């Protein structure tokens, strides 16, 4: 289960299973002229959307987490996320490996043995980033997730609206979109 938290709270992120929606027809683009060096540093997971039933079942218990993005030796990214789980701070690191164009990465889940694509869809580097992840846990078990990252724990209302519109364009419904509440736990520098 810790792996689930790693994935959800990291790109906040990947590898959770559950009830599935039909995937939308549109392809997700990547941030034009993505500048990886500007993307580094501290981010907060402010919003999530997923076709997984796990999110709908657990969203009331989720809270914002802190993630730190650092360069990896292979040109990819190390995403280290710290989150509250069972009243304790847990830290997990994911290696996002380069996958084609700048801003496109892949992540291999050690728990499921599946590979997920992770795309930086849009970012201004200073305030927000929209990420989209997709993959398959097995035949017929497609996984999709969108994540809103913010440089602060209080993203502007316009960013939440932008995230909601992006999620709906990807086929996510209101009940699959959640904005994570702020917490003072596990947010300090370590």
Curated annotation (Swiss-Prot):
Compartments it resides in: Rough endoplasmic reticulum; Nucleus membrane; Golgi apparatus; Cytoplasm, Perinuclear region
Reactions the enzyme catalyzes: prostaglandin H2 = prostaglandin D2
Primary localization class, coarse: endoplasmic reticulum
Keyword terms: Cytoplasm, Disulfide bond, Endoplasmic reticulum, Fatty acid biosynthesis, Fatty acid metabolism, Glycoprotein, Golgi apparatus, Isomerase, Lipid biosynthesis, Lipid metabolism, Mast cell degranulation, Membrane, Nucleus, Prostaglandin biosynthesis, Prostaglandin metabolism, Secreted, Signal, Transport
EC class: isomerase
Disulfide bonds: 89-186
SUPFAM superfamilies with a match to the protein in the record: Lipocalins
Signal peptide (residue range): 1-22
Free-text function comment from the UniProt entry: Catalyzes the conversion of PGH2 to PGD2, a prostaglandin involved in smooth muscle contraction/relaxation and a potent inhibitor of platelet aggregation. Involved in a variety of CNS functions, such as sedation, NREM sleep and PGE2-induced allodynia, and may have an anti-apoptotic role in oligodendrocytes. Binds small non-substrate lipophilic molecules, including biliverdin, bilirubin, retinal, retinoic acid and thyroid hormone, and may act as a scavenger for harmful hydrophobic molecules and as a secretory retinoid and thyroid hormone transporter.
Protein name: Prostaglandin-H2 D-isomerase
Native species: Pongo pygmaeus (Bornean orangutan)
Gene name, Swiss-Prot/TrEMBL: PTGDS
């Amino acid at each position: 289960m810790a792996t689930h938290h790693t994935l959800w709270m990291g790109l906040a992120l990947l590898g959770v299973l559950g009830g599935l929606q039909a995937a939308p027809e549109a392809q997700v683009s990547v941030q034009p002229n993505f500048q990886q060096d500007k993307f580094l540093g501290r981010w907060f997971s402010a919003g999530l959307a997923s076709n997984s039933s796990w999110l709908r079942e657990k969203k009331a218990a989720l809270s914002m987490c802190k993630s730190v993005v650092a360069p990896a030796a292979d040109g990819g990214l190390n995403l280290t996320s710290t989150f509250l789980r069972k009243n304790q701070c847990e830290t997990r690191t994911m290696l996002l490996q380069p996958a084609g164009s700048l801003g496109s990465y892949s992540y291999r889940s050690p728990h499921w043995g599946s590979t997920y694509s992770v795309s930086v869809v849009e970012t201004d580097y200073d305030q927000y980033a929209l990420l989209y992840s997709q993959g398959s846990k097995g035949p017929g078990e497609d996984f999709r997730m969108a994540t809103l990252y913010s440089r602060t724990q209080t993203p502007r209302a316009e960013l939440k609206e932008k995230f909601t519109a992006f999620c709906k364009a990807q086929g996510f419904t209101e009940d699959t979109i959640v904005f994570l509440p702020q917490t003072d736990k596990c947010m300090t520098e370590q």
